[in-house]
A protein has these predicted regions:
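Structural scaffold elements adjacent to functional motifs in cytosolic proteins
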Residues: 43-45
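Short, surface-exposed ligand- or partner-binding patches at beta-edge/loop junctions that are enriched
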Residues: 94-95
Length: 143
């Protein structure tokens, strides 16, 4: 079994153990490895435009807001935008700040026919540290 297969199997087992309805749950490091090893895999960043502009972007990511900024309203066109930009047959990974919005996006994608939908745990900024701040522990930025 190669590194890609091992990584996906681990993510799939993690999803089964957590009773998640999508294909798998990846750590940020695992997601990076998948992007390098899986031709055609896509990363969908579901943070807001403000987060992309002020916190940082992931190169080559598909950017679709889950919650619209300003106003923090749900993006009623999320699924239509996803279908326009990402083939339901490819492996797709969802990323947000902490892993919560991306979990919701992966749920919706899986329910809508994306059989290879994965959530990226910890998100872009990682978990909160002892002082309640992000960007110090884990996350995509530190993978």
């Amino acid at each position: 079994m190669g590194k890609l297969s091992e990584t996906l199997a681990l993510a799939q087992e993690r999803a089964r153990s957590l009773n998640l309805p999508y294909a798998g749950a990846l750590t940020p490091r695992e997601a990076w490895d998948v992007l390098q090893l899986a031709p055609g895999a896509r990363l969908v960043d579901v943070r807001t435009r403000a987060e992309w502009d002020w916190v940082g972007r992931v190169p080559d990511a598909v950017e679709i807001e889950w919650m619209l900024y300003p106003g923090n309203e749900p993006n009623a066109h999320f699924l239509a935008q996803l279908k326009r930009q990402v083939d339901p047959e490819v492996l797709v990974m969802f990323l947000c700040r902490s892993g919560a919005r991306s979990n919701s996006a992966a749920n919706l994608a899986a329910a809508s026919g994306y059989t290879n939908a994965y959530n990226i745990l910890e998100g872009f900024e990682g978990d909160k540290d002892a002082n309640g701040h992000r960007n110090k522990v884990g996350g995509w930025r530190h993978a």
